[in-house]
């Protein structure tokens, strides 16, 4: 990473964290993270959609909005997007459209909820359904912690949207890495403010670096890599700094952290076909059973209580 990108990334991280602190009001940072990280993720999916559609339709000299209005084009772009991206965001639900609504003071939180519902419904029946199912469930837009009225909640989310729009997320060719790194930075910052809760979803950089270096020693290509207690997926994803990893497998007990792990995979540019993150207790039910992995890393909750049931002896 050259110095200019590194400097930009540092500036981006600082701005995002300052924004998170400025907007959260009286809400605990640990709770507010679901809204900030959720909207950054939505921004990424929307931005990715815009670029994908521009490239897909460039030879037809037609905009995404116009293609959507034409039934024949609409069917084709939906099919292509589901195959390549795994989801569809309608033109009216793009992040840039929400920015315009905020500027015109016509945005309300129910529109955002409709946008999320539409995105999630687009994955139903597709190969990506399991990877996207419930991804935004922790971003509870009807929570009174966000505001006591729809107007109050809309105002908070409008500020987040406007603030994200003002941030320069990076150079085109490096956008995934810069945004992915910034996302991971925020996870780390939220972890630091959460105290004892931090271990649920984040392995500190130093231990993570050492684990991945040792696990990939002498390896160039890794077909399958796994983390049985994957948290937010940051440790598992760090493996790609030391080897070419094709498929990622993880299991996470906490549903909120499980959602973070899947978001993290997608933000890092891992295709939905190349990761399988499962929500459940690895000790009680190992989702991957007798599968063999070339590399495994883990930072399990060492102090957690667990059952001494006799079936563990089998």
Locate predicted features.
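Conserved catalytic motifs of ABC-family nucleotide-binding domains
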Residues: 312-314
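Conserved S-adenosyl-L-methionine
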Residues: 197-298, 303-305, 310
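Non-catalytic, mostly N-terminal accessory regions of nucleic-acid modification and defense proteins
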Residues: 1-215, 273-282
